[in-house]
Amino acid sequence: MEYLTEIVGEKGYIKVEGDLDSEQSGEALRKAFNNVYDRGKRTIVLDLTQVQIINSYGIGKVLMCYKRLKAENGVLMVKPLGGFVKETFELLMLDKLLPVDNG
């Protein structure tokens, strides 16, 4: 499993496809994050629009990315969310923590 990464200007983008609910998907997110982070990007946008299910394991990996960026005065953003993922983010108040990238 591998997630697409892209650099556009000062932002790095990670497109997560499939569910974010296993060690395999979490490891793929970590690798994609490191790929963008190691290229000097401190504003990273997670595109979770294709994710149907996210569990505590996936949330933990998202928070790991957030904490690492915050330590460097960076920002972790998300594309506009929908469905179960949006409900989960709202329930955990992650929608207050992670700004939405509408670009």
Annotate each language-model stretch with its function.
Residues 2-31:
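STAS-typified acidic loop motif
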